[in-house]
């Protein structure tokens, strides 16, 4: 049996102009997970026998991008295991490979998200988990450790209370009359396999104007994908490339994975995703 990634690559290779879509839905919006309740479940309070997921587009696009990234470089699964955990990476790849889409979403929710990042309630016999919100809050926030940076600064005033300062994530402001010199910001844990840039409010047509590569910490990063936002529907989708071909993924559509011949129209850019180039 071919994995999902192998099936997608095969569909690109065998593509005909009249059929630019993948043959089956991939990572559909939402999801229902049925619990096989045993005798002990009768005593549970509250009792529910299924889990229903709503508004999962805030994680769907990035889950699809993460799957593509992990398959693009044989070393990336090992590297990401250091940050996400070996068991998580292995389980994530297995579930995606075998089309277990609802389960892979639950894996991310329960393993990587905090309880306050989503709403949940029991309705009749269902536990409903609602991920409505912002993909930066529901996904990229949980990757901060992977992409964290640090910067040192030095003040010319010897009496400055914080003459030498280390700061993670952001530039600091200190009320002091001296001149503060900042070092180059560097990654805390070395160059990560990928970086995510917040590009909210850019139009998808602007994809033609974004840099296709970045130089960060003596490494080159290549544009691998983007997440897109439909303001009218308050809905996220994603675009990514495999073997030089761009594809658009939208879990809300019946035909949700298609080859692109131009950027999707009437959508805003939400994020750009760059992967570290392989050293030769």
Swiss-Prot record:
Record's protein name: Dopamine receptor-interacting protein 1
Quaternary context: Interacts with DRD1, the dopamine D1 receptor.
Purpose of the protein: Could be a regulator of the dopamine receptor signaling pathway.
InterPro entries associated with the record: C14orf28-like
